[in-house]
Amino acid sequence: MAAKDVRFSADARDKMLRGVDILADAVKVTLGPKGRNVVIEKSFGAPRITKDGVTVAKEIELADKFENMGAQMVREVASKTNDIAGDGTTTATVLAQAIVREGAKYVAAGINPMDLKRGIDLATQAAVKDIIARAKKVSTSDEVAQVGTISANGDKEIGEMIAHAMQKVGNEGVITVEEAKTAETELDVVEGMQFDRGYLSPYFITNAEKMVAELEDPYILIHEKKLSSLQAMLPVLEAVVQTGKPLLIIAEDIEGEALATLVVNKLRGGLKVAAVKAPGFGDRRKAMLEDIAILTKGQMIAEDLGIKLENVTLPMLGRAKRVRIEKENTTIIDGVGEKSDIEGRISQIKAQIEETTSDYDREKLQERLAKLAGGVAVIRVGGATEVEVKEKKDRVDDALNATRAAVEEGIVPGGGTALLRAKKAVAELKSDIPDVQAGIKIVLKALEAPLRQIAQNAGVEGSIVVGKITDNTSSETFGFNAQTEEYVDMIQAGIVDPAKVVRTALQDAASVAGLLVTTEAMVADAPKKDSPAPAMPGGGMGGMDF
């Protein structure tokens, strides 16, 4: 086993604090509307420029092992906040640094670290409660756009694009961010349920110019097995012909005689029909066919359900307002499924998402959820250079996560104001144990840190800004707009943060910082000493003295 290097008490805390400071100082320059960028060297390709706190944090690895441990703990704060809320990573880092710094001073002065942590936890709970109580529900598309704009570093175009996407696909819909091939950033929305299977034969096309098959108000037959003969289907085909409506057949595969018969009928005009393969594979295919059945109020024809093809009647077929089939994709628009059935299915998928441990499964389940809930939107981020596109994509990702969080738990005044106002609730806490009270004091001071940093990045003295906002007791939403360097009503000015992001940042920062403050010893691998190289043999032949 390798030898270990051990550091104790003040020596350990000093090293750890230095690591915390190095990482936090690199991350906090990105905070606020006037935050700067950080350039990160890549082992290949162009350097990466970003204003995303967690991206910077993940790149930092220090040479000194003890300093690195401190840095890694704060990196954990940023990663955790990013995983839960998707934004607020820089705020969390600034809060963690403030709590650790103050905590280290108190511990050095001889205060009990465990009581100190208890005080930090009590104060954090009070502040979180206050933030949740202040949260205002997001009701309009404009408010959604405001949240997106603030998170995208004041980029209005991004904020409005996200609001538009959310309006189209709903809060459960999937919004993905991709890199565009052009310089423009654009939004592409697919309404209804789309799956990646196209028509089985080009003869099904109804619009030759666009190469698509469009079926208005069709019946939909959902079959989980292969169809190689249409004999068993004749009764239901005849019933569909009587109604004069088109028919879409979704099956594992349609081959040979069955496909030929359908094509001939389509060309003769007897039956308006189109056939596509079922999406997915294995169990996922079955689940997706069930989703389609629920969406269209149809019945999935499966032998294990005891339904045979020859017994299928018209009421067992699904219905939709319109179906559009392209070479690669099929979109079912406005299925007639019952709202209650669809909602039941959605909550079932949500429960599966909660339980799954596989990222791949989670992604696929979220796709299914979005398709049921109303659609998929793709934001394609464009820019003049690859570096610019990557930087912009980071901001769009942040804005998207912040917007989702805002819809979930509401919004609070932005720019660090909500944390500053939470001081009032924390100040009311009183403890008989002086060391616990010291922990409460630490959080009281730390709650100012994000606002101070935002002001500092804008070139304004942080303590003056904090003083001005604290003195104004008439309005709870009064704050500092760092973009214009004015004092405004933050909600009216549209400077808002999602409550979930602010809450998560504080909880994660306090959790990790509390652990760092209570550290008394640190253990790391001792540096390996390089053994000196063996001496070179002397020249000349042995035994000869010249």
From Swiss-Prot:
Can you name a GO cellular component term?
cytoplasm
Which reaction equation describes what this protein catalyses?
ATP + H2O + a folded polypeptide = ADP + phosphate + an unfolded polypeptide
Query: Which Pfam families does its entry note?
Result: Cpn60_TCP1
Q: Write down the EC number.
A: 5.6.1.7
| Localization in the cell | Cytoplasm
What's the chief localization of this chain? cytoplasm
Q: From start to end residue, where is composition biased (Gly residues)?
A: 537-546
Q: Quick one: a GO biological-process term for this protein?
A: protein refolding
Q: What does this protein do?
A: Together with its co-chaperonin GroES, plays an essential role in assisting protein folding. The GroEL-GroES system forms a nano-cage that allows encapsulation of the non-native substrate proteins and provides a physical environment optimized to promote and accelerate protein folding.
Assembly and interactions? Answer: Forms a cylinder of 14 subunits composed of two heptameric rings stacked back-to-back. Interacts with the co-chaperonin GroES.
Q: What is this protein called?
A: Chaperonin GroEL
